[in-house]
């Protein structure tokens, strides 16, 4: 352009037309018949000033039920958690905000170290040996775990509990279809995976057993009992886990999990319409070379200084193309950084306290709802979500709650016909006693 800081000028247009040998812009469209060419002005609104545009967009945004204006008891994979103020401050730094895959370590040490710290934190939470730099979200991380299991065992059958998040299971089925894998769903009993049904399906053709911890109903799966069933047949044991729950629960790695995946949304990532999120993927050492996605390793340079580099890159698509272990590329480095900053701000003690608050407040809510005559079909231990039985359609109850400034729980009947009229309630550390009591009063006030 002739003028560096000005948009397209008439001089620019004439210079471009002259360069390509065309007299006018109309000549560029000469191959379009005259009778079908548009003439006149497009019916679009005139341009707005910046203040006018802000007002219009704000009015549109106010039509949404935001957790900033409403009290949310909705979870089902996306939760309203505390985000330390420092998270947005660090994310807004230009070297992180616009960074891409750090192929050149000599100019990317900051980003590489941030990713390395993320990997380290994931390993500490899950009790695993190696974690990658992130996945797109929990669902795609689980699907990649299934593909890894099939490739490693050279088997085609996948056993997955119906107590795993319905959308996670749908993503797994989508990935499995292209690989011609058989996905067999194991029913739940009492809110957790039916161990007898699982044992009956186990065979030498099973690539992996997949459960969620805590599961979709918030219940704590008995990993200690499930792992031997998988390993007895030399199948891999895959666990999808809420990382916040691992602040108080025994990590899956301690029970013998081969692959642990999940979604880092509880740490530093807002609800934001359900995405983008940040999946995590961790494995035991024998599977290290088959893990999908980027891996950052720590090394020393020729002067003995500590440095960070992308390692084991022969697994990746920019090296091996069609032979790569995964086609995930840019991953979710910025959201992984958000999770890392949030975890760093909280510290180990803070994560434990945050998880404990979720447990305490969720159990308080359940006890109070039971006092009002509501009941749960499941009696096992749970984390920060639980199921309650309503006497009316959940959609009707949620519409009424919304009028009262409350976002109600998830309608389980949408995915589990046998649980029609049941609500999945999530209670996080942000919910106050007054908010929980108001929710209980609204549900107990003729909604049960």
Curated annotation (Swiss-Prot):
Subunit structure, as described in the record: The glycine cleavage system is composed of four proteins: P, T, L and H. In this organism, the P 'protein' is a heterodimer of two subunits.
- Recorded source organism is Geobacillus kaustophilus (strain HTA426)
Query: Which reactions is this enzyme annotated as catalysing?
Result: N(6)-[(R)-lipoyl]-L-lysyl-[glycine-cleavage complex H protein] + glycine + H(+) = N(6)-[(R)-S(8)-aminomethyldihydrolipoyl]-L-lysyl-[glycine-cleavage complex H protein] + CO2
Pfam families, alphabetically?
GDC-P (PF02347)
Q: What InterPro entries does the record tag this protein with?
A: GcvPA, GDC-P_N, GDC_P, PyrdxlP-dep_Trfase, PyrdxlP-dep_Trfase_major, PyrdxlP-dep_Trfase_small
Q: Which SUPFAM superfamilies match?
A: PLP-dependent transferases
- EC number(s) recorded for this UniProt protein: 1.4.4.2
The text of the family note is:
Belongs to the GcvP family. N-terminal subunit subfamily.
Question: What are the BP-aspect GO terms?
Answer: glycine decarboxylation via glycine cleavage system; nucleoside metabolic process
User: Sorted alphabetically, which keywords does the UniProt record give?
Assistant: Oxidoreductase
User: Highest taxon of the source?
Assistant: Bacteria
* Role this protein plays: The glycine cleavage system catalyzes the degradation of glycine. The P protein binds the alpha-amino group of glycine through its pyridoxal phosphate cofactor; CO(2) is released and the remaining methylamine moiety is then transferred to the lipoamide cofactor of the H protein.
- A molecular function (GO) term: glycine dehydrogenase (decarboxylating) activity
Specify the protein name: Probable glycine dehydrogenase (decarboxylating) subunit 1
């Amino acid at each position: 352009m002739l003028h560096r800081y000005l948009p397209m000028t008439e001089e620019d247009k004439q210079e471009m037309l002259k360069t390509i040998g065309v007299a006018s812009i109309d000549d560029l469209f000469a191959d379009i018949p005259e009778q079908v060419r548009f003439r006149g002005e497009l019916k679009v609104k005139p341009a707005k000033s910046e203040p006018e545009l802000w007002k219009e967009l704000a009015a549109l945004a106010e039509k949404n039920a935001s957790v900033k204006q409403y009290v949310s008891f909705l979870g089902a994979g996306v939760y309203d958690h505390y985000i330390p103020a420092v998270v947005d401050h660090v994310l807004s730094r230009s070297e992180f905000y616009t960074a891409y895959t750090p192929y050149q370590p000599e100019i990317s040490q900051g980003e590489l170290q941030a990713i390395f710290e993320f990997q380290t934190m994931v390993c500490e939470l899950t009790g695993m040996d190696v974690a990658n730099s992130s996945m797109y979200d929990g669902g795609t991380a689980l699907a990649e775990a299934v593909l890894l299991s099939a490739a490693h065992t050279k088997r085609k059958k996948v056993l997955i509990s119906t107590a795993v998040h319905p959308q996670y299971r749908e993503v797994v089925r989508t990935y499995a279809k292209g690989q011609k894998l058989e996905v067999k769903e194991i029913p739940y009993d009492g809110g957790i995976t039916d161990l007898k049904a699982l044992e009956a399906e186990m065979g030498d053709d099973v690539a992996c057993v997949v459960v969620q911890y805590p599961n979709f109903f918030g219940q704590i799966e008995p990993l200690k009992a499930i792992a031997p069933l998988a390993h007895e047949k030399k199948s891999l044991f895959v666990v999808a886990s809420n990382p916040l729950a691992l602040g108080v629960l025994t990590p899956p790695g301690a029970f013998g999990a081969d692959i642990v995946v999940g979604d880092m949304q509880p740490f530093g990532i807002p609800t934001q319409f359900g995405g983008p999120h940040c999946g995590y993927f961790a494995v035991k050492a024998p599977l290290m070379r088959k893990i999908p996605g980027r891996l950052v390793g720590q090394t020393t340079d020729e002067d003995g200084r500590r440095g960070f580099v992308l390692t084991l890159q022969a697994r990746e698509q920019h090296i091996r193309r069609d032979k790569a272990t995964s086609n995930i590329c840019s991953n979710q480095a910025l959201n992984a950084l958000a999770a890392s900053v949030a975890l760093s701000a909280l510290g180990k003690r803070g994560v434990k306290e945050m998880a404990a608050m979720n447990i305490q407040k969720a159990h308080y809510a359940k006890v109070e709802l039971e006092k009002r005559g509501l009941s749960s079909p499941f009696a096992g231990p749970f984390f920060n979500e639980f199921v309650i039985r309503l006497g009316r359609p959940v959609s009707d109850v949620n519409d009424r709650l919304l009028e009262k400034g409350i976002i109600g729980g998830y309608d389980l009947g949408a995915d589990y016909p046998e649980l029609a009229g049941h609500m999945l309630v999530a209670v996080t550390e942000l919910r106050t006693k007054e908010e929980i009591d108001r929710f209980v009063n609204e549900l107990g006030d003729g909604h049960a």
